[in-house]
């Protein structure tokens, strides 16, 4: 069994509990900047994996500050290719695990992600 720092564990739990369900199939959440010393890309990946445990969630996205950029970690199951989504945001990855790094705020990253998802849904790309 893997164990976590209690503060990091509680940050992950908070992020999961505050997730927004977008377009009925996509979970989006953020990690707070005030605990940035505890947040790493692995933290974001753990949250993204946890969000996939919910029924009807096809893909999950976690936006968080890391080393003066905003990271988006993406995970998926079923038929959603998160690599394609992250490529639209300047990132990359694999079918079920991908990421992007943006030069903006967390809120702006969430907005860009939602715009990208909306466009891709309308165009039948996802």
Listing of model-derived features with the role each one plays in the protein:
Residues 1-126:
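Hydrophobic helix-and-loop "lid/oligomerization" segment in the mid-to-C-terminal part
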